[in-house]
Design a protein with these regions (language model features):
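DNA-binding patch around the recognition helix
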Residues: 123-127, 150, 193-195, 199-226
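Active-site beta3 strand of CheY-like receiver
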Residues: 45-51, 56
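Conserved acidic carboxylate
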Residues: 9, 33, 56
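Acidic catalytic/metal-coordinating carboxylates
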Residues: 33-37, 60-63
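Basic, amphipathic DNA-recognition helix from helix-turn-helix-like DNA-binding domains
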Residues: 57-60, 66, 70, 75-129
Length: 226
Protein backbone atom coordinates (compact mmCIF):
# COMPACT_ATOMS: atom_id res chain seq x y z
CA UNK A 1 0.00 0.00 0.00
CA UNK A 2 1.29 3.46 -0.91
CA UNK A 3 2.40 5.65 1.97
CA UNK A 4 0.03 8.51 2.73
CA UNK A 5 1.61 11.96 3.10
CA UNK A 6 -0.18 14.89 4.76
CA UNK A 7 1.05 18.22 3.35
CA UNK A 8 0.32 21.27 5.50
CA UNK A 9 1.11 24.58 3.79
CA UNK A 10 -0.92 27.74 3.23
CA UNK A 11 0.87 28.33 -0.09
CA UNK A 12 -1.65 26.54 -2.30
CA UNK A 13 0.56 26.56 -5.39
CA UNK A 14 3.50 25.08 -3.48
CA UNK A 15 1.31 22.44 -1.84
CA UNK A 16 -0.04 21.48 -5.27
CA UNK A 17 3.50 21.18 -6.65
CA UNK A 18 4.53 19.01 -3.70
CA UNK A 19 1.50 16.81 -4.26
CA UNK A 20 2.37 16.31 -7.94
CA UNK A 21 5.98 15.45 -7.12
CA UNK A 22 5.09 12.96 -4.39
CA UNK A 23 2.28 11.32 -6.34
CA UNK A 24 4.70 10.81 -9.25
CA UNK A 25 6.80 8.78 -6.79
CA UNK A 26 3.86 6.57 -5.86
CA UNK A 27 2.71 8.28 -2.66
CA UNK A 28 -0.85 9.33 -1.89
CA UNK A 29 -1.16 12.95 -0.79
CA UNK A 30 -3.65 15.06 1.15
CA UNK A 31 -3.05 18.82 1.37
CA UNK A 32 -4.52 21.26 3.90
CA UNK A 33 -3.88 24.97 4.43
CA UNK A 34 -3.94 25.57 8.19
CA UNK A 35 -3.10 24.01 11.53
CA UNK A 36 -6.66 23.26 12.63
CA UNK A 37 -7.42 21.31 9.46
CA UNK A 38 -4.07 19.56 9.77
CA UNK A 39 -4.97 18.20 13.20
CA UNK A 40 -8.43 17.17 12.03
CA UNK A 41 -7.03 15.43 8.94
CA UNK A 42 -4.38 13.68 10.99
CA UNK A 43 -6.98 12.20 13.33
CA UNK A 44 -9.24 11.21 10.41
CA UNK A 45 -6.74 9.61 8.03
CA UNK A 46 -3.65 8.72 10.15
CA UNK A 47 -1.01 9.64 7.54
CA UNK A 48 2.36 7.89 7.40
CA UNK A 49 4.30 11.18 7.31
CA UNK A 50 3.53 14.88 7.77
CA UNK A 51 5.17 17.65 5.73
CA UNK A 52 4.56 20.71 7.87
CA UNK A 53 5.15 24.38 7.08
CA UNK A 54 6.02 26.34 10.21
CA UNK A 55 4.29 29.58 9.18
CA UNK A 56 0.58 28.79 9.21
CA UNK A 57 -2.54 30.86 9.90
CA UNK A 58 -4.22 30.13 13.22
CA UNK A 59 -2.40 27.32 14.99
CA UNK A 60 1.19 27.62 13.79
CA UNK A 61 3.35 24.75 12.62
CA UNK A 62 5.37 24.49 15.82
CA UNK A 63 2.24 24.06 17.92
CA UNK A 64 0.84 21.53 15.43
CA UNK A 65 4.11 19.62 15.67
CA UNK A 66 4.01 19.69 19.46
CA UNK A 67 0.43 18.38 19.56
CA UNK A 68 1.12 15.61 17.06
CA UNK A 69 4.19 14.47 18.93
CA UNK A 70 2.25 14.19 22.20
CA UNK A 71 0.13 11.44 20.73
CA UNK A 72 2.08 9.93 17.85
CA UNK A 73 5.55 9.02 16.62
CA UNK A 74 4.62 9.77 13.00
CA UNK A 75 7.59 11.19 11.05
CA UNK A 76 7.33 14.99 10.80
CA UNK A 77 9.37 16.94 8.25
CA UNK A 78 9.26 20.73 8.51
CA UNK A 79 9.17 23.10 5.55
CA UNK A 80 10.87 26.36 6.46
CA UNK A 81 12.51 29.46 5.00
CA UNK A 82 16.28 29.05 4.87
CA UNK A 83 16.90 32.03 7.14
CA UNK A 84 14.55 30.91 9.93
CA UNK A 85 17.29 29.59 12.22
CA UNK A 86 15.33 30.08 15.45
CA UNK A 87 12.23 28.49 13.95
CA UNK A 88 14.19 25.44 12.79
CA UNK A 89 15.52 24.82 16.29
CA UNK A 90 12.08 25.44 17.83
CA UNK A 91 10.50 22.99 15.41
CA UNK A 92 13.07 20.30 16.13
CA UNK A 93 12.64 20.80 19.85
CA UNK A 94 8.86 20.51 19.39
CA UNK A 95 9.37 17.06 17.92
CA UNK A 96 10.07 17.35 14.19
CA UNK A 97 12.42 14.70 12.80
CA UNK A 98 13.87 16.67 9.91
CA UNK A 99 13.46 19.83 7.87
CA UNK A 100 13.64 20.95 4.25
CA UNK A 101 14.63 24.60 3.66
CA UNK A 102 12.77 26.57 1.01
CA UNK A 103 13.32 26.82 -1.87
CA UNK A 104 14.05 23.15 -2.46
CA UNK A 105 14.53 20.88 -5.44
CA UNK A 106 11.88 18.18 -5.93
CA UNK A 107 14.44 15.37 -5.73
CA UNK A 108 15.70 16.76 -2.41
CA UNK A 109 12.19 16.68 -0.96
CA UNK A 110 11.60 13.14 -2.21
CA UNK A 111 14.91 12.01 -0.69
CA UNK A 112 13.95 13.45 2.70
CA UNK A 113 10.54 11.76 2.62
CA UNK A 114 11.94 8.39 1.56
CA UNK A 115 14.65 8.58 4.22
CA UNK A 116 12.06 9.03 6.95
CA UNK A 117 9.81 6.30 5.54
CA UNK A 118 12.58 3.78 4.92
CA UNK A 119 11.55 0.27 5.86
CA UNK A 120 12.92 -1.68 8.79
CA UNK A 121 14.07 -5.26 8.59
CA UNK A 122 11.64 -6.89 10.97
CA UNK A 123 12.94 -10.42 10.30
CA UNK A 124 16.42 -9.99 11.76
CA UNK A 125 16.38 -10.38 15.53
CA UNK A 126 18.91 -8.24 17.33
CA UNK A 127 19.16 -7.39 21.00
CA UNK A 128 21.55 -4.80 22.40
CA UNK A 129 22.41 -3.91 25.97
CA UNK A 130 23.91 -0.72 27.28
CA UNK A 131 24.14 -0.43 31.04
CA UNK A 132 20.59 -0.76 32.33
CA UNK A 133 19.04 -0.46 28.88
CA UNK A 134 17.82 -3.47 26.91
CA UNK A 135 17.13 -2.78 23.22
CA UNK A 136 15.01 -5.04 21.01
CA UNK A 137 15.99 -3.77 17.56
CA UNK A 138 13.41 -5.69 15.49
CA UNK A 139 10.61 -4.84 17.91
CA UNK A 140 11.73 -1.21 18.32
CA UNK A 141 11.45 -1.50 22.10
CA UNK A 142 13.75 -0.02 24.76
CA UNK A 143 13.44 -1.14 28.37
CA UNK A 144 15.07 -0.29 31.67
CA UNK A 145 14.21 -3.14 34.00
CA UNK A 146 10.47 -3.61 33.66
CA UNK A 147 9.90 -0.10 32.33
CA UNK A 148 9.40 0.53 28.61
CA UNK A 149 10.88 3.81 27.39
CA UNK A 150 8.89 5.41 24.57
CA UNK A 151 11.09 6.74 21.76
CA UNK A 152 10.21 8.08 18.34
CA UNK A 153 11.55 5.97 15.44
CA UNK A 154 14.31 8.49 14.78
CA UNK A 155 15.37 8.65 18.44
CA UNK A 156 15.44 4.85 18.44
CA UNK A 157 17.60 4.74 15.30
CA UNK A 158 20.01 7.22 16.87
CA UNK A 159 20.34 5.13 20.03
CA UNK A 160 20.86 1.91 18.04
CA UNK A 161 23.52 3.50 15.82
CA UNK A 162 25.52 4.48 18.90
CA UNK A 163 25.00 1.17 20.70
CA UNK A 164 26.00 -0.97 17.71
CA UNK A 165 29.47 0.56 17.83
CA UNK A 166 30.28 1.01 21.53
CA UNK A 167 33.16 3.35 22.26
CA UNK A 168 33.32 4.55 18.65
CA UNK A 169 33.15 8.31 18.51
CA UNK A 170 30.74 9.43 15.79
CA UNK A 171 31.07 12.86 14.28
CA UNK A 172 27.81 14.71 13.82
CA UNK A 173 28.25 14.40 10.06
CA UNK A 174 28.57 10.61 10.37
CA UNK A 175 25.37 10.46 12.40
CA UNK A 176 23.55 12.63 9.86
CA UNK A 177 24.49 10.14 7.17
CA UNK A 178 23.89 7.00 9.23
CA UNK A 179 20.64 7.96 10.98
CA UNK A 180 19.04 10.54 8.68
CA UNK A 181 20.37 9.03 5.47
CA UNK A 182 22.12 12.10 4.08
CA UNK A 183 24.38 14.98 5.04
CA UNK A 184 23.21 18.53 5.66
CA UNK A 185 25.70 21.10 4.48
CA UNK A 186 27.39 22.53 7.59
CA UNK A 187 24.28 21.99 9.71
CA UNK A 188 24.47 19.75 12.76
CA UNK A 189 21.43 21.09 14.61
CA UNK A 190 19.43 17.99 13.73
CA UNK A 191 21.89 15.83 15.64
CA UNK A 192 22.29 18.16 18.60
CA UNK A 193 18.56 18.61 19.21
CA UNK A 194 17.77 14.92 18.82
CA UNK A 195 20.57 13.96 21.20
CA UNK A 196 19.01 16.32 23.75
CA UNK A 197 15.59 14.74 23.20
CA UNK A 198 17.02 11.23 23.47
CA UNK A 199 18.89 12.04 26.68
CA UNK A 200 15.75 13.47 28.26
CA UNK A 201 14.15 10.04 27.90
CA UNK A 202 16.94 7.54 28.56
CA UNK A 203 19.30 9.27 31.00
CA UNK A 204 18.59 9.20 34.72
CA UNK A 205 20.13 12.68 34.85
CA UNK A 206 20.20 14.33 31.39
CA UNK A 207 22.55 17.00 32.73
CA UNK A 208 25.10 14.28 33.55
CA UNK A 209 24.65 11.80 30.72
CA UNK A 210 26.07 8.29 31.02
CA UNK A 211 24.51 6.67 27.94
CA UNK A 212 25.05 9.24 25.17
CA UNK A 213 28.37 10.95 25.84
CA UNK A 214 29.59 14.16 24.21
CA UNK A 215 33.18 14.09 22.98
CA UNK A 216 34.02 17.76 22.75
CA UNK A 217 35.16 18.93 19.38
CA UNK A 218 34.26 15.62 17.75
CA UNK A 219 30.74 14.30 18.36
CA UNK A 220 29.06 11.58 20.42
CA UNK A 221 29.63 8.02 21.60
CA UNK A 222 27.82 5.41 23.65
CA UNK A 223 28.79 5.38 27.31
CA UNK A 224 28.66 2.61 29.88
CA UNK A 225 25.23 3.60 31.11
CA UNK A 226 26.31 2.88 34.64
Amino acid sequence: MAAHILVVDDDVALAEMIGIVLESEGFTVTAVEDGTRALDEFHTDAPDLVLLDLMLPGIDGIEVCRRLRRESDVPIVMLTARSDTADVVAGLEAGADDYVPKPFKPRELVARVKARLRGRDESAEEHLRLGELSIDVAGHVVRRGGETIALTPLEFDLLVALCRAPWKVFTREELLEKVWGYRHAADTRLVNVHVQRLRSKIERDPERPEIVITVRGVGYRAGTGS
